Curated annotation (Swiss-Prot):
Fe cation 2 binds at residue 56. Keywords: Cytoplasm, Iron, Iron storage, Metal-binding, Oxidoreductase. Belongs to the Dps family. GO terms for molecular function: ferric iron binding; oxidoreductase activity. This is DNA protection during starvation protein. It comes from Campylobacter jejuni subsp. jejuni serotype O:2 (strain ATCC 700819 / NCTC 11168). It catalyses: 2 Fe(2+) + H2O2 + 2 H(+) = 2 Fe(3+) + 2 H2O. The lineage of its organism: Bacteria, Pseudomonadati, Campylobacterota, Epsilonproteobacteria, Campylobacterales. Protects DNA from oxidative damage by sequestering intracellular Fe(2+) ion and storing it in the form of Fe(3+) oxyhydroxide mineral. One hydrogen peroxide oxidizes two Fe(2+) ions, which prevents hydroxyl radical production by the Fenton reaction. Does not bind DNA. It is found in: Cytoplasm. It is an enzyme of class 1 (oxidoreductase).
């Protein structure tokens, strides 16, 4: 896949995840509501930034970003969720799946950018690979049981 096609795919995915993370944000229930509510707010704000960054990089490369809502939703390949009530644990597990998906997509973007000798996009991809690897490590630690003494 070309760099611009991968960026457009990720733009659509970021839009979908922005909506999806709002669903988690508004519809989480349980004892850890407040912390998950704050975490998902940060997550959807990051998706808005990713949406903008992907679109702007596409424009810098001389192509057109996706601006039609219908096209964004049709092109999103990120994991779908069909519910509107979540436990805190479910939200963390679902975000883990979403971040694993994004990590894989950034690796594809990095590979495409390196093939096309696009160092700017490769740097963008690598920065996000590091970000999502760290996020996944933190989520993994959250999902583990208590330490044994």
């Amino acid at each position: 896949m070309s760099v611009t096609k991968q960026l457009l795919q990720m733009q659509a995915d970021a839009h979908h995840l922005w909506v999806k993370f709002h669903n988690y944000h508004w519809n989480v229930k349980g004892l850890q509501f407040f912390s998950i509510h704050e975490y998902t707010e940060k997550a959807y704000e990051e998706m808005a930034e990713l949406f903008d960054s992907c679109a702007e990089r596409v424009l810098q490369l001389g192509e057109k970003a996706i601006t039609c809502q219908k096209v964004l939703m049709e092109n999103a390949k990120s994991p779908k969720v069909a519910k509107d009530c979540f436990t805190p644990l479910e939200v963390i597990e679902l975000i883990k799946q979403d971040y694993e998906y994004l990590l894989a997509e950034f690796k594809k973007l990095n590979e495409a950018a390196e093939k096309e000798s696009d160092t700017t996009t490769a740097a963008f991809a690598q920065e996000n690979i590091a970000k999502y690897e760290k996020s996944l490590w933190m989520i993994g630690a959250t999902l583990q049981g208590a330490c044994k003494m």
